[in-house]
Amino acid sequence: LYGFYDVRRSQYSNIFRQGSFGFELLSIEWDFRVNGYVPSQKQQRVDSLNTAYVSGNNIVMRAGEERAYWGTDFEVGRLLKTFPESNLDADLRGYVGGYYFDNSAPGFKEITGPRARVEYRMFDLPWLGNGSRVVLAGQYQYDEVRGSQGTGLLTVRIPLPGNGDSQKLSRFQRRMVNPIVRDLDIVLNQVRGPEECAKLQLTGQELKDLTFIDADTVNAEAVFSAAGTDSVVLFDGSKGTINTSTGYVFNDGQLALAGGNSVNVVGCNSGAVARFSYGAQPTVNGSLTSIDVFTMADRSSIVGMNITGGENGIYGNNLSGFTINRNTISGADEDGVHLDGDINGTITDNTFTGNGVTGYNDGLEVQNFTGGTISGNVSRNNGYGYYIENDISGGTISNNIAENNLYDGFYITKMSGGSITGNTSKNNGNDGFYFDDVMTGGVFSDNIASNNDEFGFNFDGVNGGTISGNQALDNAYAGFAFYDDINGGTISGNIAERNDDGFYFDEDINGGTITGNIASNNRYDGFYFRDEISGGTFSNNIATDNGDDGFDFDDFDGGTISNNIATGNGVNGIAFYGEVSGGTFSGNTATGNQDNGIKFGDTVSGGTISNNLASGNVDDGFDFEDITGGFITANTATGNQDVGFDFDDIVSGGTISNNIASGNQGYGFDFIAPIQGGTISNNTASSNSKSGYFVNIFGGGNTASFTNNSAIDNALKGYDVRTGAPQSGVGTNTGSGNASDNNY
């Protein structure tokens, strides 16, 4: 008696398990054995065998399945011949028997038939040692399911070395160590299961009681309407174009399914998925520009159509639960798809081409998008690609393409919720993405605008929401433009390359966060702020290799500008062309720019300018006009080709302290205009190619304090003070290693 547990992975990657048991009776001349096999009866899928087709007026499917068989086999064997006359200890045995395997599931035929085999065995071979064995075997079996099967086998048994020489076994002892003979496999079979109803995988609708429409259908629009609620209508293009002068009006829950397309259907019982196709794809043409070719209803679906002409290819009003999928819509007088009212449904994988080109119309127009999905669509050569007439308050608009449209790729009036992500807009006549009103919420992320004739992304204002991970590439105007105030929200991780300006802000910045954005190789400014910054955070942005300034600011009176980097720009790294009267400007870096590293082109009257670095710039590290207040502290200018800190106009107030100017080719600190007030203290000028400090004049109603500064190893004077003296601090300024005037 014996038992085994078997595990098998089939060619379809299904795992099966079985237990087997048996017994055998052996003598010198005879063999008799019986085996039984009990597998797991669980059905496994074979998707490659799934099939779907029309049966009567229904679409049905049969699921491919694989099952293991239970069964038994037996055989009787006899010694046929020995070979005493040869030098080999050998025998020849023959076996006959049969097998029976079955599974009671529908469609699985029993597997039964005869089996015969023969074995030639050689024992105790001199070159392999006592206990060795070589067996040559052949087997043949036949059944109606698998047909004729033949196998051959060669086995070699070699004894392992032990203590001393092994002894030869007797003939009966050798029989007791024969391998157990059983079916080592788990018997499997694959069939298609019974017919079952099918559902459209896309919507879950059962595909039954079909109505068929083709070019020969009389009064097809009435036939379509009469099919009723939740009906399925199959359009077949085998007989040519289906023309309509009145349009097809959907019932609630009705499905219009086009032939000639392969769609996924799901078995109602098995859950298996099969591909279904029928006939040819139809072209449904609206012959009048005053009618909509299809008018949708709630829960209705249209799949796979080629729709041409009409006023709108598809129209709907206040729809929910609908599906528009894999249609091609072209040549509509107005819009490919036009949906009025509040819209919540699914619009996926459609193509809109050449719609609305004689007017300002669109591939897809939605009035209010409140939920659902608009994804995977392509809109090209229309007036506008995608047009949201009023508001996006929910849902997802993702992975759509707008290209070669006459005007904007995406026109969005306003956005208060939902997400717009992963879309591409390129080669359009106006903007890639245009927002007509303030963005107050939602997520706008990972979109691409490239090679558009105007702006890549053209926003109005931003009061909330997130704009992140978008790319503006090679657009004729600014990559990102904001034409109203920024009061809130987050603008982060966006990239602008090879545009006019990279990022353009036309109005005030009062709040929000602008962080981690990159502007590179744009024709003009990397970041251009045309009006006031009075709040919010602008941080960790990068401007490299732009044709004009890396960062161009106007007035700055509040908020934080920190940890930004400007490198290799054509003019200034960072420039303020308006007054700095408040806020914090800190931790910024400007290196290798073609003019000044950081330029303040108007009055500094307040705020804090601290811990910034300007190095390796072609002109000054820091360039200031008049200083009337504020704090300029702990900044560093090093290795610039002119002055480290250049003060071009009167200093009458404020604090300039703890700054470092080293290794610049001009003065460390250059005060060309009168110093009339303020505090200049604890600064260090070292290793500059001219004097450490150049002061043209302490003059006016002088209240200046010039104290505890240091000048070290400058090529000319440590302190070059031409006229006058500060109100306080003379004698506190020190230095060493300068050509002269180490102390002041």
Residue ranges and their predicted role:
Residues 40-95, 101-108, 113-115, 121-217, ...:
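Flexible, glycine-rich linker and terminal segments associated
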Residues 247-250, 274, 289-296, 312-318, ...:
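Glycine-rich beta-solenoid repeat tracts in large extracellular/virion proteins
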Residues 256-257, 301-303, 321-325, 344-348, ...:
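All-beta strand scaffolds that present successive hydrophobic residues in beta-strands
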Residues 256-311, 356:
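Right-handed parallel beta-helix/beta-spiral solenoid domain characteristic of secreted/periplasmic
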Residues 297-383, 387-394, 403, 411, ...:
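Right-handed parallel beta-helix
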Residues 230-271:
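N-terminal extracellular ligand-recognition/capping segment immediately after the signal peptide
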Residues 208-242:
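Acidic Gly/Asp/Thr-rich repetitive segments characteristic of extracellular carbohydrate-active
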